[in-house]
């Protein structure tokens, strides 16, 4: 399974309904499970981004999940593929 980090900003619609944000995350988590994605951590943040979500799953399942969640109109996200130390060691081990 791959690890992804999503940095999220609320849209105007999302911030107007910010009180619903915890419930939206719970619903997104249920959708994630149905797609074979595990939400490992989620944080609401102050500063440049409104939330950070760390999830694991197959690449196509993460993509489907993030597209669906984004299509609801409450967030915009940038999703990053993340590598732990063991994965990075394998990657650099393949370098000539």
Predicted features and spans:
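A compositional/biophysical signature of low hydrophobicity enriched in polar/charged and small residues
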Residues: 1-96
